[in-house]
């Protein structure tokens, strides 16, 4: 590694590379096309990022682009890059939802590295504001999603604007037909790297379900939140359901944050920060908005609505138990959905029925399934910060807030 990367590695207390990092490092350094498949939480971002940073020269020419499916993932990867890059290297995040005029102005800084979403990057390239002629490496993070039928044309459209002689790197948590036939959609001859065996830590993710009629699911979530023990990332299947559920929680004075593709970038960033800082116990989200979302030491993921397929279940559940940490995945299901759930969980995982009360979660603790400290809202002076801005201007209150509902 370059000396500055090695120093950062040592500062963070890292020792060995993870299997996916070890398997892809030389391939990426040598300029090979790569398709890498590895479970969530196995260090995929650093697997492509560190060798990429070693290759980039400080010459004010755009040499590498990282394509991602969402604003949140773009910002998240941007934060990681800022931690690891040389101070002289210029990196920009160019994602949809942000001010395009400001992005155009920032491009005058002549970045060597860009992270962005296909739609916004295509827009900037069409305006001739984003110069692609010197691009040597193109990374697709969450490649299975970027190449899914509903996003394929937009992704391909941008790739075609890049030089034909360039390195292609694709990373994904799941392998599907799209990735297997990637050479049909993109001009590349990849080396395949598959790390299907989970890291030991992933085995510490416990999968449980709570049986409930649909009409009582919101009551279950309120019970969980009122225990005031753990934060949870809660997945629903639609924007409408997310908004309705947020309003119900608000009505019962339960603080939460809402992360959907309908919110602008400022509100979405605010929701994530409120959750990360422990200001709210619940972050409600949809699959699109939370794709690749990385929240350190997240103890619990809740499938409020059961996902449609195994890939989505894997991506959702992968938000907890990352990098060898412990986690708990809870699914709210009807009696008929129990059979469907059994088809979604990992083949080597066990599934248990649970009730929502602290004693059962304590059982999970004894088995070292959830190690994060119990959720304790941060004490604020006066009125608590609005976590979910609703139309009637009501605001949530944290546990120890002295303010009253307006």
Annotate each language-model stretch with its function.
Residues 4, 39, 163-164, 229, ...:
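Arginine-glycine-biased low-complexity disordered regions
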Residues 1-37:
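Conserved pre-motif I regulatory segment
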Residues 101-106, 242-250, 254-290:
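Conserved helicase ATPase core of P-loop NTP-dependent helicases/translocases
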Residues 118, 141-143, 304:
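Walker B catalytic acidic pair
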Residues 22-34, 44-59, 80-84:
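Walker A/P-loop NTP-binding motif
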Residues 123, 131-198:
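Post-DEXD/H (motif II) to motif III coupling segment of the RecA-like Helicase ATP-binding lobe
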Residues 2-7, 61-126, 134-137, 251-259:
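Conserved nucleic-acid-binding Ia/Ib motif block in the N-terminal RecA-like helicase ATPase lobe
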Residues 203-248:
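Conserved interdomain hinge at the start of the Helicase C-terminal
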